[in-house]
C-alpha cells in the first residue's frame, strides 16, 4: 500500500491509503475489516487431492474363440475446501470388450461392445483461478462473523434471520457496493451442477468366404448400435 501511494504520488495523485489504514492492514488484528486474502492459502486450497484410475484387463481363448475385456474406473475430487466446491468430483466407469469367433474354415464372426458412464459434480462459479490472479487481497473478506454485527442493528439482524446463506451458523457472505458478488459467494451460495454422460456402442458381424463358389468371393454383414446421452 505504501508503494501504491508512492506510485500515485509519482503520477501527481493523492494517497489512497492513510498511514492508519496501512498500519491496520499490516497488523492483521481485524482481518474482516482490513482484509488480506491469499486465495492460494490452505484456508481455501488443499495441499493435495485424490485421483484414482484403475484398469483391469482380461483376455483368453482358444483356436475357436478369443476374447478381451478392459475395465476402467476413475474417481477424482478437487483442491477446494470451501462451499459447494469442496464436493467437486468426477466418477467414471468404462468397459470395453470383444469376442472373435472362428466357426469353421470359411465362417468367422465378431462382437465388439463398449459401455461408459461418467458423472461430474461442480460448484457454480468456475472462475476461481482467474479471480486469484486479479482480485486485490484487500478488496473483500470472504466471510464476516455474525458477532461483528451491532446488537442494536435490527434491520441487519432481520436480514440475517431471513437469509438462506448463513455459513456454519456464524458467518454471512461479504461484499461491498462495488463488489456485490465474488467467487467465494458463488461457491457458498450459487449451488452446484451435476452432469451425467452415458454411452453404449455395439457392433457384430459375420464374414463368409465363398471361394468354393467363386475364387475371391466373400460375404460380409454387420449390425451396430451407437447410443449416447448427456444431461445436467
Q: Where do the model's predicted regions map?
A:
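A surface-exposed, glycine/aromatic-enriched loop/edge motif typical of exported proteins
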Residues: 1-22, 116-173, 228-232
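Residues embedded in well-ordered regular secondary structure
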Residues: 1-82
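Surface-exposed, low-hydrophobicity segments enriched in Gly/Pro/acidic/Ser residues
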Residues: 13, 24-28, 153-154, 189, ...
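Extracellular loop and loop/strand-boundary signature of outer-membrane beta-barrel proteins
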Residues: 41-44, 79-85, 98, 187-193, ...
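Outer-membrane beta-barrel transmembrane strands
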Residues: 46-66, 71-72, 112-114, 174-232
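Transmembrane beta-barrel architecture of outer membranes
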Residues: 53, 90-96
